[in-house]
Design a protein with these regions (language model features):
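Phosphate/diphosphate ligand-binding glycine-rich loop within oxidoreductases
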Residues: 1-96
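Short phosphate-engaging motifs
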Residues: 41-44, 121, 145
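Short, acidic/turn-prone active-site loops that include or flank metal/cofactor-
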Residues: 58-63, 142-144, 162
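Glycine-rich adenosine-cofactor-binding loop
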Residues: 76-81, 88, 92, 96-133, ...
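NAD(P)-binding Rossmann-fold cofactor-contacting core
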Residues: 131-154
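Short acidic low-complexity segments
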Residues: 153-162
Length: 162
């Protein structure tokens, strides 16, 4: 399979500006039909997508934008949540199986799940932890972001000094 994965560093005071550039009519014809969105643009990418997948909408962050071939609309997805939570669960399951334990539910259910950061990836992990029955504890430097995430996912929050 042949593919390209170009990377650009986009610095702007307007968080929408870099995403609007990526989702422009110029970008997608040059670079196929998909783009990945990184820090700190995942929350702004929600507003720049024509449609947002229900999971990404619930999380409030988009990290993958796909151009739908039939109508050219840009669809925003969040792959951080499922990929990260599943990887954590798989690692914990392997450890428990090695210790002779059997699991039928998520190994993070009923556990405390610590998050450092309240940006787009942090939002995805908080959502995933809550959906699996874990309690999120959020550590972040910016109290405003932290409070929004804490209110949305009912986690505990702790302010970090940088």
């Amino acid at each position: 399979m042949e593919f390209r994965f170009p990377c650009w560093s986009m610095i702007s005071r307007n968080s929408l500006e870099p995403i609007q550039a990526l989702t422009s009519q110029v970008f997608f014809p040059l670079f196929d039909e998909t783009c990945s969105v990184g820090i700190p643009h995942k929350e702004a990418a929600v507003r720049c997508s024509d449609e947002v997948h229900p999971l990404a909408k619930s999380i409030g962050a988009v990290n993958t934008i796909v151009r739908r071939p039939i109508d050219g609309k840009l669809i925003g997805y969040n792959t951080d949540c499922e990929a990260s939570i599943t990887a954590i669960e798989d690692a914990l399951r392997e450890r428990r199986v090695a210790n002779g334990e059997a699991l039928r539910t998520s190994p993070i259910a009923g556990k405390t799940f610590a998050l450092v950061g309240a940006g787009g990836a942090g939002r995805a992990l908080a959502f995933g932890a809550k959906s699996r029955g874990a309690q999120a504890v959020i550590f972040n430097r910016i109290m405003r972001e932290q409070r929004c995430l804490q209110m949305q996912f009912q986690g505990k929050l702790y302010h970090m000094n940088a």
